[in-house]
UniProtKB/Swiss-Prot annotation:
Keywords: Transferase. It holds the Pfam family CoA_transf_3. PANTHER family: SUCCINATE--HYDROXYMETHYLGLUTARATE COA-TRANSFERASE. Involved in the methylaspartate cycle. Catalyzes the transfer of the CoA moiety from succinyl-CoA to mesaconate to generate mesaconyl-CoA (2-methylfumaryl-CoA) and succinate. This is Succinyl-CoA:mesaconate CoA-transferase. Its EC number is 2.8.3.26. It catalyses: mesaconate + succinyl-CoA = 2-methylfumaryl-CoA + succinate. One of its GO terms (molecular function) is CoA-transferase activity. The active site is at 175 (nucleophile). Signal peptide: none annotated. Belongs to the CoA-transferase III family.
Length: 396
């Protein structure tokens, strides 16, 4: 049993932000119905694919963020499919979409129309620049992807080396962080409806989310009037808090607290540094020379020995690649690697497990991602649509 077992979600989203949002809900037990346009989600054909696949039903991108969902292919531009969709809406708790503002209205399926069919409905959108219902801006006609959101929201400006160009963060945080916030908003709206019986519109913008993610830059600029910029892997107000090269790789050390600093100096056999720079202010003021002292020590030691010296006393870790993560017992003990079937292949695919852990209703991937239109008959039957005389077909 999942915490959201009684929640029915109609998921019209595609690519990453929306599917990741609804994936979080599906992992917690929600019945997520992926309502796909003719031809399906754009990322169904994206690689990588498993090596032994006889047919490429979909790749890892689609599998990862659409696990545990059901699929129905509908063309909202046809009367039959639109009526079928409205029948689904009448039984739904939540509708989620990530189209450009105004797209659903073109099919006469906007929030106001859907509320006529289900007054308690929670309608949620993820857009690059938000929906006019929650705050109209000049950007809302513009398309957006993760890269755009990272650039506008300040993420790229503070990422990278100080003498290098603005740099995109590796994971698609413009999509993923927005997705997480949107899931929080949906669950808050569900709680509000349980107390009041009132549905509402939940709107999360990628640009807004990146500003929230970069919250430090907002108060820094407010305090000193200077725009924060790139500092590599270091921190503007904490030291040492950085990556360092070891003899066989890289490690990170976060010893900015006085006690951790003293323990680091002890491991380095440099009690003089602890005595000369006993507080955060003195360490930050002399960060370049102190960084050189630490780097001289780390480069002479292999990472395992270095981490053994610091273990339990100083926050430190190796910089791991994905193979290292797959080999880490912690990841297996926490069930952070999940095996799911891959249609058309003998081998299973490994995807990231659920990071949310609960003692009574443990979230987990609810099986593989669906084939396109795989659950059409059962979904239309549940909605009371006569699949014999009122067949709902999609026009490609």
């Amino acid at each position: 049993m999942g915490a959201l077992d009684d929640l029915r979600v109609l998921d019209l989203t595609q690519v990453l932000a929306g599917p990741y949002c609804t994936m979080l809900l599906a992992d917690m037990g929600a019945d997520v119905v992926k309502v796909e346009r003719p031809g399906g989600d754009l990322i169904r054909s994206n690689p990588p694919f498993v090596s032994d696949g006889d047919e490429e039903a979909y790749g890892g991108y689609f599998q990862s963020v659409n696990r545990g969902k059901r699929s129905l292919e509908l063309n909202l531009g046809t009367d039959e499919d639109r009526e079928a969709f409205l029948s689904l809406v009448e039984r739904a708790d939540v509708v989620v979409e990530n189209f450009k503002a105004g797209t659903m209205e073109k099919f006469d399926c906007g929030y106001e129309t859907l509320r006529e069919h289900n007054p308690d409905l929670i309608y949620s959108s993820i857009r690059g620049f938000g929906d006019p219902r929650t705050g109209e801006t000049h950007r809302q006609g513009q398309p957006s992807f993760d890269l755009i959101a990272q650039a506008l929201g300040g993420v790229m400006e503070i990422t990278g080396q100080s003498d290098g160009p603005p740099t995109k963060v590796g994971p698609g945080v413009g999509d993923l962080f927005t997705a997480v916030l949107n899931a929080v908003g949906i669950l808050a709206a569900v709680h509000h409806r349980e107390r009041t019986g009132e549905g509402q519109y939940v709107d999360t913008a990628m640009y807004d989310s990146m500003v929230s993610l970069c919250e430090r830059t907002v108060y820094q600029y407010s305090c000193d009037g200077e725009s924060p910029t790139r500092q590599g892997n270091s921190h503007p107000t904490l030291f040492p808090y950085d990556s360092f090269e070891a003899a066989d790789g890289h490690v990170v050390i976060a010893a900015f607290a006085d006690g951790h600093w003293e323990a680091l100096c002890e491991a380095m056999e440099r009690p003089d540094l602890a005595a000369e720079y006993p507080d955060a202010g003195s360490r930050i003021a002399n960060r370049e020379s102190l960084r050189a002292e630490i780097a001289e020590w780390t480069t002479a030691i292999d990472s395992e020995t270095l981490l053994d010296l610091l273990e339990g006393r100083v926050p430190a870790a190796p910089v791991q690649n994905t193979a290292d993560i797959f080999d880490d017992p912690h990841i297996h003990d926490r069930e952070m690697l999940a095996e799911v079937d891959q249609p058309g292949a003998d081998d299973q695919m490994t995807i990231a497990g659920s990071p949310i852990k609960m003692t009574e209703t443990m979230p987990s991937p609810g099986g593989r991602a669906p084939l396109l239109d795989e659950h059409k008959t059962e979904l239309l039957d549940e909605a009371g649509v006569d699949t014999g005389t009122n067949r709902v077909e999609s026009d490609d």
